[in-house]
Structure formats: C-alpha cells, structure tokens
UniProtKB/Swiss-Prot annotation:
It comes from Mus musculus (Mouse). Residues 27-52, 200-223 are annotated as: Disordered. The keyword Metal-binding does not apply. GO terms for cellular component: cytoplasm; cytoskeleton; sperm flagellum. CDD domains: LRR_RI. The gene is Tcte1. Keywords: Cell projection, Cilium, Cytoplasm, Cytoskeleton, Flagellum, Leucine-rich repeat, Repeat. Component of the nexin-dynein regulatory complex (N-DRC) a key regulator of ciliary/flagellar motility which maintains the alignment and integrity of the distal axoneme and regulates microtubule sliding in motile axonemes. May play a role in the assembly of N-DRC. Required for sperm motility. This is Dynein regulatory complex subunit 5. Testis-specific (at protein level).
Amino acid sequence: MQETPSVPSNSSSHSQSVLTIQRQVSALGSSSTGPTSLKTSSTPTPGQLKTKVPNVRRMRRIISEDAEWSLAIVPLLTELCIQHIVKNFQNNPILKQLPLEHQKKVLSNLPPELPLTVTANLIDDENYWHRCCIKRWSVCHVSRHGGSWKRMFFERHLENLLKLFIPGTTDPNVILDLLPLCRNYVRRIHVDQFLPPVRMPTPLQGEEQSDSGSEGEGSEPEKDHYQLQTLVGGLKHLEELDLVYGVKDCGMNFEWNLFLFTYRDCYSLAATIKACHTLKIFKLTRSKVDDDKARILIRSLLDHPALEELDLSHNLIGDRGARAAAKLLSHSRLRVLNLANNQLQAPGAQSLAHALAHNTNLVFLNLRLNCIEDEGGQAIAHALETNKCLSVLHLGGNKLSEPTATLLSQMLTVNTTLVSLNLSCNHIGQDGGKQLLEGISDNKTILEFDLRLSDVSQESEYLIGQVLHANREAARQRTLNPGHFSSPTNNCTENSVV
C-alpha cells in the first residue's frame, strides 16, 4: 500500500522534471534565437545606416565651434529669390521693380564682371562701380573724376580703348559701340598716347619697275591717328579734352614718326573742338604743335561759347602762334592760358601784352621757358598797369634782366589784382632785386613772389619775404573778418542808398 502511492509521485516528479527541462530547452532555444535575430537586425546595410542614424549636429541647438551656425536651417524665401535674381541677372536684370532694401542686397551681391550693356544704364549705385574700379585698376583717384566712381569707370575705360586703338587694325565699332553706354557719364577725356597705323612691309618690286625711278611712290605709310570727331560729337556732357599725340613705352622701336601730329589730325581735331559747345578745358601738350597747326586750332576756338582754359605747353609754337592766341583773348571768355616751354620771343609777347591790356577775363598766364627777353617782359609789365583781372603770372626762364625788373617794380605799385608772380631762372641781378623790393613794399595784394636763381641778393629776398608774410597775414584777417575791413567808401555808399 505504501509502495503504490510512491510510484505516481515519482512519475509525476519525473514528468515535471521533463516538462521543466523542455521549458528550459525551449527557453534556451528562444534565448538563442532571440539574440541572433536581434544581432542580425542591428547590423543594417550602409543605405539603411544613413537613413536611420540621427544627425547629431541638427539635434544640437548651439554649436560653439561654428560662429556662423544658425538654428534656421531653411533660408527665407526672399533670400532664395534674391539669390536667383543675382544668378540670372545677366539674362533677366530685375532691379528697379524690387523694394529698396532688396535692391541693396542684389547690388551688393552682383559680380563686377557683368557686361556693360546690362549695367551701364541700369545701375547707379556708387558702391557697385567702386568694386568695378578697384577690381580693374590698382590705383584709383576718384577726385579727378568729380568724386563719382561710375564716371571714373567709364572715363578710364574709354581712355584705355583710345590708347590701344590702332588705325587700320582695330575695329572702330569697339569704341562707337560704347558711346550709347557712356555718353551720359563721360565729362573728361585724358589720352596720353595715340598709336599710329601699323607699318606694313613694302612688297618687292621687279627690276624694271625699280629702274623706272618711281619705287618710292605710294610706299610711305599713313601716319594719321584715330579721329575723335564722331566720338566727341556723341558725348553731350564733355567738358575737358586732354590729349598727347605720342607713344609711351615704345622701347627699341623708337622712331620720330611715332610722335607726329599730322595736318589731317590737326584739321580733324579743330573741327572736333569747334563742334563741342560744352568744352571748357582743352589741352594739347607734347605733340610738336608748330605755328601753322596752332593757328588752325585757335581759329576754330574763336568765339567759343564755353572755353575757359587753353593749354598748348611743351610744343613748338612761335610768334605767329602767339599772335593767334592774342586774338583768341579778345574773342573768347578764356580765363587760363598756358604757353609754357614753346618758342615765343619778344614779338609774340608784345602781341599777348597788347591783348592783355584790354582783357577782362584772363586770370592765369604761364609763359615760362620761352625767350621773350626784356622787350617782351617790358611790354607785359606795361599791360599789367592797366589790366584789372590777371592774378597769376609766370615768366620764369625767359632771359629777363634789370630793365624788366624796373618796369615790374613800377607796375607793382599800382596793380591791385596780381597775387602770384614768378621770375625764377632769370638774370634780375642785385639792382633789379632792390627795385622790385621798392615796388612790392607799396603792394598789399601780392602773396607769392618767386625769385629763385635770379641773382637777387639774400637781403632783398629776405625783405621781400617779410612783405609777403605781412600781405598773407592781412589776407587771412580779411578772410576771417570780412566786414571789419570793408572800405569807407562802400559804407558811405551803402548808407546813402539806405
């Protein structure tokens, strides 16, 4: 009886142990399959890795090592539009239709390499043209161009085209196509080089033709330079024309013909300046202009409505050219005349003096480095006794001596308009210096008097300097207190009128 119940207990325990073993085996199986499946699922392919691994950089709200980082990941729509406008500006220039703040952003991002056909008449922003100038030229003197960067760009761009133009080789449309783009901005043209045509080698001729004695016919090349008439006629605001007919940096290819101002050039230039009614300043220097060519040019300037300054210095002008200039003084509103370093002598200076005695416009006359001598110097001194407008006179290097100094001394006692007088590099001498000292002692208006290398004694130079210092101090006081130095006659006149 006791053994019978023990059997089922053993069998039940056995079955429980078997069940327990099966559960453990199944558990082991499940545990073994579980990590295996997890392991296989945790090793994704490279493509799955890119999509499932989070971007730690985007999750960080502050990135201290990146000073330009911003939490705004997507740019504003306006910024995208501005970027698109800048990128496609050459094909679709949209600027005036934008608000002012957006225009500034577009202009600040535009590249300076855009074609002038797009930007010339559309963009007026000085900052943009400033970037264009700085990118193209290392040295930029914007003050010489009225303080405008846009004007500077177009003036210098046009000048570069003119300097490199080769007649017969360069296409004239290169310059004429620029005219509609720059006509409103160019006020000054300064060209210090005009290239001549390229000299082509003469073809070999047969013996029969060479023996005929005509081998030189037609072999001389053209020497005329670029003609400015069409260009200047299209520049409606042109005020200054500064030209030099020569070649720079010619090196071993130097020839005198490179510096030739031909008659065709002269006639064309004369017609050009005559038709330009806005021209105020005309300069033609270092171009071998002789009397005949000077007369042609000056004839075209008679009764010019706007001309105020004429500079023909460093040329070959003699007395005949000086007489033409004297006639111009009576038939123009010229205020500045520069004939320095020419071939003027006494007759030419006398012609100028005769016109100067009755002139009421000229304030600056430069005759240095000529040879007017005492006859011409005395004539000018006589003219200044009656002239009431000239304020600057330069007679340096003209072989003047004591007789001229005597008359200049008399002139200084009565002249009240001359402010600057230059007699340097002459033979004034000690006696002439003393006479000038006597004359300037009674003069209260002259502020500059140059007597260097004129054989004047140091004592006279010192005393003249003291007089000039007193005149400058008085002029400064008049500038600071203009009402205090008003003349009594003016006050009486004003009181009587009141």
